[in-house]
Amino acid sequence: MIRRLQDSGDLVRAFPRVHFVGIGGTGMSGIAEVMLTLGYEVSGSDNADNAATRRLAKLGARVMRGHSAANVLGTDCVVVSSAIREDNPELMEARSQRIPIMPRAAMLAELMRFRRGIAVAGTHGKTTTTSLAAAVLSEGGLDPTFVIGGQLLAAGANAKLGGGQWLVAEADESDGSFLRLNPLMAVITNIDADHLENYGNDFARVQAAFAEFLQRLPFYGLALLCIDDPEVAALAGKTPRHVMSYGMSENADVRAEDVVQDGPCMRFTLRLPEGTTTPVTLALPGRHNVLNALAAAAIGWQLGVAPDTIARALENFAGIGRRFNDLGEVTTSTGARVRVVDDYGHHPRELEAVFAAARGGWPDKRLVVAFQPHRYSRTRDQFDAFAAVLSTVDALVLSEVYPAGEAPIPGADSRALARAIRARGRSEPVVVGQIAGLAEVLPDVLQDGDLLLMMGAGDIGYVAQHIINNGFVGEPA
């Protein structure tokens, strides 16, 4: 049947049924929630049940476990995660039925088309920066729509349909999909060598992709660039778009001065264009989070949020799931009382920043790290950097690599990494073959008063939560 848009009145009524293949992913679930709120009939499938799928089901989405051709019958559009293989039965059925298939980033671009878009890109810090920006704009009364790659703890969700005209979202460079977006403002936090397998193992192509991302801005758009990062600073002088810089450099348009760490918080003076200064207490640890906060402050300033309102939003920020998430204290079977922090960091540069934040906030505690490497290709490409940064902690437990769909690569596993760390002569790492056994090994390593960092982008977060709920016994469900 041929549908007439003028008969339905709007696109939701014309094409009401949208199906998400891989709906439980962080990027997918956020878009699905926004579309549910817009009035679409949302369905989706995923191989795993998680907090995101359960939340969507409660909101009214029809969520199926596993993938089947029958799942897409009757749908008007299929949205697909970049993690889904081309031979997925739902994609094959959609093609045979000539149902439109849209990559996740393309659907995000469609949502952004009906709002004024702010896209946050960068190898590290996207989720925190996007979350802080959403908090600043919300505090400023702008009621933004946001789509974030992690749970904003104050909202209990990673997405929200706001009543205002602005949409702030992460722009994912990992597979180049951020080049589908056409924002009005573009933030670049930093540029690093990661996900090189998607760029022909050529860092120059990564650099070129970020340059092209800025070219997606309209001529009246704005690039917000962290000039503390050398790669981003190099872009600042080349892009033919309006640029506003931020950082701790004296040359930054928006900068932080007199930065000090006070336990889990950072204190600094926020200097805005035209010389306005405001004291800020940021409710996140680490100098890297100060940079993330500066990006959010720059966005707020551009949109007319008052400096004291920006400062209040940063001070009241409740955090994001798995970003230096302080889960509290727990007692081991040997009687040691330890503090547990859960973090998503999985790149050497991220580990270095988190370790610095931990030592700055708790300088008298031993730093014990349980780390689950993520992807064999990243472990191979960043092998020496991983060995160097992991050698700096007081005690280390390594689980096997979380493959994320990759086949094992010889010499890029946790045992090889442990040997390289051991050869540096600074620590004696413990290797656990399966992540499920991690909790029972940790009491042999921990001492009273330790700070335990549970780090990685795989499923180690479930172990951290299991330890808080059940102690160091049993396996996470």
UniProtKB/Swiss-Prot annotation:
Localization of this protein: Cytoplasm
Domain of life where this protein originates: Bacteria
EC number: 6.3.2.8
Gene3D superfamilies, sorted: Mur ligase, C-terminal domain, Mur-like, catalytic domain, NAD(P)-binding Rossmann-like Domain
Keyword entries, A-Z: ATP-binding, Cell cycle, Cell division, Cell shape, Cell wall biogenesis/degradation, Cytoplasm, Ligase, Nucleotide-binding, Peptidoglycan synthesis
Main location: cytoplasm
GO biological process: cell division; cell wall organization; peptidoglycan biosynthetic process; regulation of cell shape
Function: Cell wall formation.
Protein name: UDP-N-acetylmuramate--L-alanine ligase
Organism name: Xanthomonas axonopodis pv. citri (strain 306)
Primary gene name: murC
